Amino acid sequence: MAIEKMKKLRLLAVRDQKKALLRKLMLLGCIEVSEPELSELSPELRQHLAKEGSDVTKCRTDFATLVQAVELLDKYAPQKSKLLSAKPETEVGTILDDSTLADTIETARRIVSVDESVRRANAERARLAGAMDSLKPWLALDYPLDGQGTQRCAVTLGFVPASVSLAEVSQSLAEVTEEAEIISVSADKTQRYLALVCFKEDLAAALDALRVHNFSIAAFGNAEGTAAENTERLKAELEELDRQKSELIDEICAMAECRQELKLCADRMDTKVAYAEAEGRLYGMESVVALQGWVLARKVPEIEESLEKFDCAWELCDPEPEEYPEVPVQLRNNKITNALNMVTNMYSLPSYDGVDPNPLMAPFFILFYGLMMADMGYGLIMILAAVVAMKKMHPRKGSLSFCQLLLYSGISTFIMGILTGGFFGDALAQIGKILGKPDGWGELWCLFSPMTDVMTVLIGAMVLGLIHLNTGMVISVVEKIKKGDAASAFWEEGSLWVILIGAVMMALSVGSVGGVPVVLVVGCVMLFYGGSRGAKGFGKLTSLFSTLYNTVTGWFGDILSYSRIMALMLAGSVIATVFNTIGGIANSLWLFIPVFLIGHSLNFALNLLGCYVHDLRLQCLEYFGKFYKDGGRAFKPLEVSTKYYDIAED
C-alpha cells in the first residue's frame, strides 16, 4: 500500500457554529486539528485573534476520576468475565450523549473519596498495630507506663541489646549505688527489656552507669495505665476501625452496579478531552474562529460536503516540501500489511516523503520468522491462538495487528516445519520408541534438517540475506530516481551491483582478461569514484579509505547477521529434541507427558519472543538501513475516543 496523502486545511467559521462544526469534524474522524500559523496572517488580523479557551484541564481531571473509580470497583468488587471476551459495543450517539455525565462523575468522586477513607483507615490501623507490637514486651509488667514512681523512688523503663547479660548490668549499677535494682521484664532476639528502680537522687548516676551497656529509655507517648490496659484499649480501637473500614468497602461494593455506566461515561469524557484539546488549538475573535489542520486527501469530497452545511470559508492545499517534517503520517494497509503496523510503529514511522515499509517488509518478516521457528506443532499453536483471539475478542487497531501477525507467522512456522520435518521436535519418534514401535516410526519427511544440514541452512540464510539487502537497494534506487537523484543511485547502489556481479564472475572464472577480473575492477573504480565525488584535495584520499572500509565491513557484517536465522532454527530444534529425549529416558508415557509439556512450553515461549526480536533486527537495521527514511509523526485525528467500549460499525 502507501502513505496516505494529506491536505492542509485552513478554515474560518462563525463563532455560533463552532461547537457544531467541531462535533461534525469529530464524527468524520479524518482531520487533525493544529494551531494556525499566525505568521502567515497580516499584522492587522493577528492583533485581533486570540487563542480560544477550553476546559481541557477539567475534562482530563474528570476522565482520570472516572477511570480511577472503575479501577477501584475492579479492586473491591471484581467482576467475573469470560476469557478472551470482546469489548461491548455501543453507538457513537450514545458516547456523545452526556445527559447522565454529571451525576456519574459525582458517583465516581464518591467512590474515590470513600477509597481515600479506606486508605486512611489502613494507615491508622498500621499505626495502632505498631503501637500494640511496641507494648508486647511490657505486658508482664503490672506498672503504669506513665508512672512517676513514689515520693522518693524513681522507676525507669528501658532496654539494652539482647547480647548484654543482666549480671553485667546489675554489677555496673552496684558500683554507683547499692540502693537500686534492675528488673528483667522480658526479652526477645534483639532487645532485653528492663525496669530500673532507685532513689531519685541516684537516678542520674544509675543512668550513666547503664549507658555503658547501651541502655535506652523507653518512650510511650501519651499512654496511660499499664501495657495490658493500653493493649485492650488499642484492640477495641482496632475492632472499631475494622468495622468502619468494612462499612466503607461495602459502600464501594454497593456502587458496583454503576460499573458499566462509569465505563461508558469514562469513554464520553475521553471524547470530551479530545474535543477540548482541539478547541484549545483554535484562534478567534468576537464573531469568527480560525481552524487549521491536516486532512486525509481521499476524504476531501466528504469533508467539503460536510463543510458546505456551515457558514464557513475554507482552503485545501497540498503541503510544500519544506512542510514535510510537520505533515502527519498514516499508513494505508490491507489485511496482510496491516499486521506489520506494530513493527513499524515500534521502530519509527516513515517520513511523509518516504516509502511505506509494510508491503516491502511483510513477505520477508513472515518468511524469516517461519524459518527461525520452523516447527509444525508451534505453528499450529500460534494459528489456533490467533484465530481464537480474533473470533472471541474482535480486536481492533494495535490488538488486531498483533493477532494478524501471530496468525501469518504461525502459518509460515507451520509450513517451514513441514519442510524441516519438525513436530514438537522429534516428539513422534520418541513416543514411538516408548510404545515399542519399529525404528523409523514417527519420523517425518523433510526437505532439509537443521540438525544434519547445518551448512546448507547457513548458506541458504546468507542467500536470503543477499536477496533481502538487494531488495532494499532496489527500493532505494527507485526512490532516488523519483526524486531526480539518479546519479547517486548509479554511483552508490549501481557500483555495488557491478562489484557483486564481478565477484560472481571471478568465482566462476568468467570475464577475466589476462587474469584480471575486469567487471570487478570496473565496479571498484565506480565505487571509489562515487565515494569521493564532491571531495577535494586530501579529502579524496580519506573518502577512498572511508568508502572501502564502510563497504567491506558493512556488507560483510550485514550478510553475516543473517546467520541468526540458522542459529535460531538450530537452537529451537536442539532444545525441543533434548526435552523429548529427557522425557523418553524412563521409557514411560506418563513421565514423558509432563516433561514434554514443561519443556516445550519453555522452548515455545523463548522462541516466540526470540524469533520476533531477531527478525525485528534484520528488518529495522539491515533492511531499513538500505532505503528507509524515518522520523514521521503519527496522524492523530479528532475522533470519538474510547477505552472501554468499541464503536459499532455502520
Region locations from a protein language model:
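Conserved, carboxylate-rich catalytic/transport cores that coordinate ions
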Residues: 2-8, 16-22, 26-33, 300-650
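Long, charged N-terminal accessory/stalk domains
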Residues: 1-361, 389, 396-399, 403
